[in-house]
């Protein structure tokens, strides 16, 4: 269905192609820009967690430069596509991967350890709507959102994790305008995620500056910011 009905969110090519079934964590490819996509589908709502494959494979994947972008599909009892979300690969960091308990010794694959993707932990900027309530989104808007999301790409996985965590804190503030002092209120949450860092406030300021340079927020002066 995806190959026949969905355009490439990166370059706008009208269709993407199926890949052979034996390709690990890869289901589709754009023949124009070469982008690789994985599809996970679920009847009903996605919820807060997405069941994924082997934990070790997932951790290798998010550290790879060739990891695929992820399509998440919700479908109805009669197999109608309800919603389709794209999560760009730049939003995958270790913090959103939950390790499951190994299978018991009596299981067919004893000791195998799977994982979950913590969907609720992904910032909203990393959930690009392609279909909502069976209505296809504007192609140009989808491409623009992907291009902006790509700005969050960093060479360091640790740096990316920090950037996404601070962005999530920005998103959690209900108002469009916010202050540095409001951001400091999330200090304990960030400290719990980054236990080895002992200068959280400085890190918040640093990541806010990066988010400003990348066009996600605007600095208004005197410790005041505005979401863009």
Where do the model's predicted regions map?
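Residues immediately within or flanking Cys/His clusters that coordinate Zn2+
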Residues: 5, 25-27
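Short cysteine-rich clusters marking metal-coordination/redox-active sites
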Residues: 8-11, 30-33
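Short metal-binding segments enriched for Cys and/or His
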Residues: 34-68
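Long, low-complexity, charged/polar intrinsically disordered regions in eukaryotic proteins
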Residues: 86-165
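Positively charged, polyanion-binding regions of nucleic-acid-associated proteins
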Residues: 157-177, 209
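A short acidic, leucine-rich amphipathic alpha-helix
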Residues: 182-186
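Short, positively charged loop/turn segments that connect secondary-structure elements
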Residues: 188-204
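Charged low-complexity interaction tracts in eukaryotic proteins
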Residues: 202-228
């Amino acid at each position: 269905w995806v190959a026949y009905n969905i355009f490439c969110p990166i370059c706008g090519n009208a269709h993407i192609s199926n890949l052979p079934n034996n390709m690990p964590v890869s289901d589709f490819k754009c023949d124009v820009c070469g982008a690789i996509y994985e599809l996970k589908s679920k009847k009903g709502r996605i919820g807060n967690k997405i069941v994924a494959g082997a934990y070790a494979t997932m951790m290798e994947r998010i550290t790879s430069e060739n990891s695929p972008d992820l399509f998440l599909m919700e479908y109805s009892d009669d197999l109608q596509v309800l919603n389709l979300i794209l999560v760009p690969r730049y939003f995958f960091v270790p913090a959103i991967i939950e390790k499951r308990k190994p299978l018991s010794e009596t299981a067919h694959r004893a000791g195998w350890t799977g994982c979950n993707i913590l969907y609720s932990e992904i910032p909203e900027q990393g959930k690009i709507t392609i279909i909502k309530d069976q209505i296809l989104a504007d192609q140009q808007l989808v491409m623009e959102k992907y291009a902006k999301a790509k700005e969050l790409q960093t060479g360091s996985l640790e740096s990316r994790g920090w950037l996404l965590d601070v962005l999530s804190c920005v998103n959690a503030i209900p108002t469009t305008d916010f202050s540095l002092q409001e951001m400091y209120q999330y200090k304990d949450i960030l400290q719990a995620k980054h236990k080895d860092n002992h200068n959280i406030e400085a890190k918040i300021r640093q990541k806010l500056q990066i988010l400003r340079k990348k066009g996600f927020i605007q600095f208004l002066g005197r410790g005041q910011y505005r979401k863009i």
